Structure formats: C-alpha cells, structure tokens
UniProtKB/Swiss-Prot annotation:
Protein name per Swiss-Prot or TrEMBL: Fructose-bisphosphate aldolase class 1
Catalytic residues (UniProt): 176, 213
EC number: 4.1.2.13
UniProt xrefs under SUPFAM superfamilies: Aldolase (SSF51569)
Pathway(s) of this molecule: Carbohydrate degradation; glycolysis; D-glyceraldehyde 3-phosphate and glycerone phosphate from D-glucose: step 4/4
Family statement drawn from the similarity comment of this UniProt entry: Belongs to the class I fructose-bisphosphate aldolase family.
Gene it is expressed from: fda
Gene3D superfamilies reported in the protein's UniProt record: Aldolase class I (3.20.20.70)
Species this chain originates from: Clostridium acetobutylicum (strain ATCC 824 / DSM 792 / JCM 1419 / IAM 19013 / LMG 5710 / NBRC 13948 / NRRL B-527 / VKM B-1787 / 2291 / W)
Pfam family, any one: Glycolytic
UniProt keyword annotation of Lyase present: yes
Biological-process GO terms, alphabetical: glycolytic process
CDD domains (alphabetical): FBP_aldolase_I_bact
Length: 295
C-alpha cells in the first residue's frame, strides 16, 4: 500500500471523481455529453469515445489535486493511456490524484428487495492487474431498493467478503451498497444498512482498512459514528440521481462526508464546447462539489 496515497485519501480536503461508467451506463454518459448512440456501431468505438471524454476531463486544468483527491476508473480505462502513460500513472504522477478501479460486473436480478453483485469470476487476475497498474483501491456496487433486512444483510455480507480478499492484496476496497433515493422506505433501509456495516466492521482484522460509498442519508450526519471507526479510511457519497445542485446541497449538510460523484460531476459538459467553455464548466462544477465536501 502506498502510504503517501493513504495519507492523501484519509486526511486531505477534496472529493473523489467517479469516472467509472461501465458498458451498461456508458451510452447514457455519452448521450449526456452530446454523443448519440448512432455515432458508434460497436463496443470498441463506444469505449474509444468515452475514453476521449474522460481524457478531456482528466487533462483539463480544472481537474486538479487542489479539489480532487482520487478518481475511480472503469477496467477498460486502466489499460488505456493518456500522453503515453497508463491512466493510473498519469493521474498520480502528473496530477497527484489517487487512482481507484471499479471491479464489479454489474447487478443481479432484484431479490429480497436488493440487487447483489454478479459474480466477479476473474477477481484474482483483476486484482493482480490493478496492482501492476499502480491502482490504490477498488470499488464495487450493490443496490438496495427496499428495507428488507434479509436482503440488506446479503448485500453487506457479499460486500465485506470481497473487501476482505481485496484488502489482503494490499488494496483499499470502497464498499458501495447504494440505497435507492426513490425508495419509499429509504430511511429504514439506511438504519438496517448501518447496523449490518457496524457488525462487519467490528469483525475486521485490526489492520484492515476499507472505505464506504453510500447514498446521502435522509437524516443528516447519520453516518458520523461510522467515520470514527478505525477501519474506515473515509466515507464518500454518491449522487444517486439527484441533480448536481441538490446533491451538493444535501451533501453540505453532512459534516465529514465527501462526494464521489459521476453523472453529477459531468453535468453540463458537452463535446461541442470549446476547450475554454469546457474547462470553465468543469471548473465551476468541481469547485461547487468541493465546497459541499469540506463542511
């Protein structure tokens, strides 16, 4: 584990940029950026286009370590380069931004009010590749739609089982059990989720470090006590479908919670913008997300 990166993630002010749209969510991300689905005819062309978008974001002067602590990458992005450097190396060596890797393969069908992660059949190879490419940590997402205690327990059990394997390889896992912001019993789901997370944290080995990526809670500062747990490096929040302004407003009410936004970060960016317009739009978004993350 890179101690310099650990200190940066655990102590510094800023937020984590989520640039990890996968095959399923990439068309939506490109459409938001102004690239229609008829602009590409296969996955390779689609991933080339999204890498150009991510490269434009990462290389922007607005995307800098004053505001951004880390960036979460999609697996395909890890193998690609920016200015002849692998993306993770470019982020750390050129920008002082800590690289993370999304490792999940998407969600299973809804059962017991939740969607577990699909099996990660190539986990060992993926973690080996991540270490070779100088990745600091990983991220994996599950989804909670209903306050079903059995389902939520299954989600957290699966997350921590994987987190243990990841931490044993010297990487820092970001555990992401997202609660649906549209759920009618969101607050109850959050109570059940916190209970399960607390149980698992108390069972971890003394040296094991994890991060949590959670929906912005209904009750302000609901996760404050989890932040104090010695196993927890940082708790970050997903935007979860809120607009950037609403996500920022809700986030700012939660002290110590920092952003890890994806769609809300790239809101209002367009392929048709000049570099000046693009950089200005990105800069405004980054500064506003940063301000909401340092309360």
């Amino acid at each position: 584990m890179n101690e310099t990166q650990m200190n940066r993630i655990s102590k510094d002010k800023g937020f984590i940029a989520a640039l990890d749209q996968s095959g399923g969510s990439t068309p939506k991300a490109l459409l938001q950026y102004g690239i229609k689905e008829n602009s590409y005819s296969n996955d390779e062309e689609m991933f080339n286009l999204v890498h150009e978008m991510r490269k434009r974001i990462i290389k922007s002067t607005a995307f800098n370590s004053k505001y951004i602590l880390g960036a979460i990458l999609f697996e395909n992005t890890m193998y690609r380069t920016i200015d002849h450097k692998y993306t993770a190396d470019y982020l750390w060596n050129e920008k002082n931004i800590v690289p993370f890797l999304k490792i999940d393969k998407g969600l299973s069908e809804l059962e017991n009010g939740v969607q577990l992660m699909k099996p990660i059949t190539n986990l060992d190879e993926l973690l080996k590749a991540a270490i070779e490419k100088n990745i600091f940590g990983t991220k994996m997402r599950s989804f909670i739609k209903e306050a079903n205690s059995k389902g939520i327990k299954m989600v957290v059990d699966q997350q921590f089982e994987l987190a243990d394997k990841i931490a044993n390889q010297g990487l820092v896992p970001i555990i992401e059990p997202e609660v649906d912001i549209k759920s009618t019993d969101k607050e109850k789901s959050e109570e059940l989720l916190k209970l399960e997370i607390s149980k698992h944290l108390s069972d971890l080995d003394k040296e094991t470090k994890v991060m949590l990526k959670l929906s912005i809670p209904t009750k302000d500062n609901f996760y404050s006590d989890l932040m104090k747990d010695p196993h927890v490096v940082r708790i970050v929040a997903l935007s979860g479908g809120y607009s950037q302004s609403e996500a920022n407003e809700r986030l700012s009410r939660n002290n110590g919670l920092i952003a890890s936004f994806s769609r809300a970060l790239s809101e209002n960016l367009s392929i048709d913008q000049t570099d000046e317009e693009f950089n200005e739009t990105l800069s405004n978004s980054i500064k506003e997300i940063y301000e909401a993350s340092i309360t």
